[in-house]
UniProtKB/Swiss-Prot annotation:
Assembly and oligomerization: Homodimer.
Descriptive protein name: 2,5-diamino-6-ribosylamino-4(3H)-pyrimidinone 5'-phosphate reductase
Purpose of the protein: Catalyzes an early step in riboflavin biosynthesis, the NADPH-dependent reduction of the ribose side chain of 2,5-diamino-6-ribosylamino-4(3H)-pyrimidinone 5'-phosphate, yielding 2,5-diamino-6-ribitylamino-4(3H)-pyrimidinone 5'-phosphate.
Enzyme class: oxidoreductase
The keyword Lipid metabolism belongs to this UniProt entry's keyword annotation: no
This protein's UniProt keywords: NADP, Oxidoreductase, Riboflavin biosynthesis
Amino acid sequence: MSLTPLCEDLPQFLQNYLPNAGQTENTIVPFVTLTYAQSLDARVSRGPGVRTTISHPETKTMTHYLRHHHDGILVGSGTVLADNPGLNCKWGPDPAANSPRPIIIDTKQKWRFDGSKMQELFIKRQGKPPIVVVTSEPIIKEQHVDYAICPINDTTKLVDWKKLFEILKEEFNIRSVMVEGGANVINQLLLRSDIVNSLIITIGSTFLGSSGTEVSPPQTVNLKDMSWWKGITDVVLCARLADD
């Protein structure tokens, strides 16, 4: 499916929130962009595991423009199990070459590359094979898949995000990562101003209701350096997380 042309004013609007090589050369972690689409009532889907369209086609094109500017694209296993996404880039003169490397958080090792949309696109040379994040040696090692073994944080009992991003840069040369979801991943990283460099949120013109899957971090999060863009039906907020 072809993309709607990118709105002419979006590149300039996004410019200050995109990865810059100079910003990551002397750091041990990649440039991290946290980006997602939500409804007016802060829902990212109609319910757990329910694939939901929120964005207008023009902001879907923006998503692929963002993918073009990142080395990796990270999602949780719940998202890939529910949506079976391709996670490739369809924007630009050579989208396949500029597609980000999919990075899948799969600590329970439920997801398989074999038979997935990602594998289909990889075979067609329209996408790249994934890096799967696990907490111990994988039970099954699939062909073309790389594995990042990342410890659990002793305090939170969740993925050690700082260590993971260090591994992605050091072992896989991932210098910029676009985090797309799902809600659990987003809620965790909204609290990490020490890791997240940019926040880009598309807000669709819809309410998804109280049964929807909500983005709501467990504590107050303040933003800074905010900019707004208005489209046909969506608005886009670009910002940075304020320090605690």
